[in-house]
Amino acid sequence: MSKKALLMILDGWGLGDHGKDDVIFNTATPYWDYLMETYPHSQLQASGENVGLPDGQMGNSEVGHLNIGAGRVVYQDLVKINLSCRDNSILKNPEIVSAFSYAKENGKNVHFMGLTSDGGVHSSLDHLFKLCDIAKEYNIENTFVHCFMDGRDTDPKSGKGFIEQLEAHCAKSAGKVASIIGRYYAMDRDKRWERVKEAYDLLVNGIGKKATDMVQAMQESYDEGVTDEFIKPIVNAGVDGTIKEGDVVIFFNYRNDRAKELTVVLTQQDMPEAGMHTIPGLQYYCMTPYDASFKGVHILFDKENVVNTLGEYLAANGKKQLHIAETEKYAHVTFFFNGGRETPYDNEDRILVPSPKVATYDLKPEMSAYEVKDKLVAAINENKYDFIVVNYANGDMVGHTGIYEAIEKAVVAVDACVKDTIEAAKAQGYEAIIIADHGNADHALNEDGTPNTAHSLNPVPCVYVTENKEAKVADGRLADVAPTILHILDMVQPAEMTGCNLIK
């Protein structure tokens, strides 16, 4: 008899501290209690670097399902770059090697430009400092930093401090602050080319207020009532840091939307009517892919294509699969679970159950869970699927309302649906793995007793429903779920999946 597996994702169903805030623990869940007493279970980490997010950041449904389906940790750009700086693998990055080797061999200037703040939305000071260190290592004669000031993701007068930090770092590393301008000009995203031209003229033609002390120049701008975001162009009078033919430019913003327009006028398209022309022979490096249509630019950290996800691998091996959820979590069990792919694979069926039309889900805490369960049980009884993934949305969607009584009702509904689903699956010879993508209903109150509507940092359960009395399940993270499913199906794990089978 061929093996079959059911993966049940209870959205927002974390393992709480059993205090008053832990609605799941404090609500009567007879079937969940039976599962915990009867079957092997463990804990999975579902937040921070365990799911490819910055350390200490709570997990979310998109990232959770991506990691679950991928069978590996899928790192966000910021985390990928952070890790590369931390373990020094950035030094072996072929584009980094090409940029600095070219500058060294041809005696060219190196320019770093980007948002100079610790806001963490578009860029990171740590990345800029690391680039300065690499320039020092390559012994580059002229390294210039062009600072775009923030004031949106940071306090409006914090920029002066960032320039002080940068100058202190450059003093022991490499680089000089060549120019300063507000992000209002350098990082427009609405085709206001007259703003972009202010930045272009500063970078290429050295047009701006001349200053010998860049920190003092920032203070003077504040004194005139002009804060970081709107700082008018400032030029360091002590250096010629303009961008010239054949120079190396590294734009260190990792978010693409506000890095595109300046890149366009420097590298992609002449705008004679606005007095802007691309610069010949520029060796231009973007931190991440800014736009698929850009030609002739280098990319330091390219987008990862997540290949051989669980869905793709099952399809390639001729297995039949079903993905089912209500509207609120349908994209999660399809698009995100399949690594960012919209189209179903061969032999992949999908069932979408409409979520209830209510203003907020505390008005209908059971949501469409019973309808999902009925359709799912019917599909299980057809006995044609090798693999089924289902998401019950209530713990998360009702958890976000912060209304305790509603969350209790949501938990009761999920418990009832889990029972009917698992009993049907057992009767048809399925083994099941029950997990969550992140916590929420397990932490419904803040310490002061006010409602907490956010996700939790708690680990999530992993229950293995099996007839095998000897089985044990190890602790792990969400990336270990797909390899565990493949183990149940007696399939070899593909090389791209770096997670571990948790069944011992």
UniProtKB/Swiss-Prot annotation:
GO MF? manganese ion binding; phosphoglycerate mutase activity
Is Transferase tagged as a keyword? no
Record's keyword annotation contains Isomerase: yes
Q: Where does Mn(2+) 1 bind?
A: 396, 400, 455
Q: Which GO terms describe its biological process?
A: glucose catabolic process; glycolytic process
Keywords, A to Z, come to:
Glycolysis, Isomerase, Manganese, Metal-binding
Looking up InterPro entries in the UniProt record yields:
Alkaline_phosphatase_core_sf, BPG-indep_PGM_N, Metalloenzyme, PGAM_B_sf, Pgm_bpd_ind
Domain of life of the organism encoding this protein: Bacteria
Q: What residues form the catalytic site here?
A: 61
Name by which UniProt lists this protein:
2,3-bisphosphoglycerate-independent phosphoglycerate mutase
- Per the UniProt record, the source organism is Bacteroides fragilis (strain ATCC 25285 / DSM 2151 / CCUG 4856 / JCM 11019 / LMG 10263 / NCTC 9343 / Onslow / VPI 2553 / EN-2)
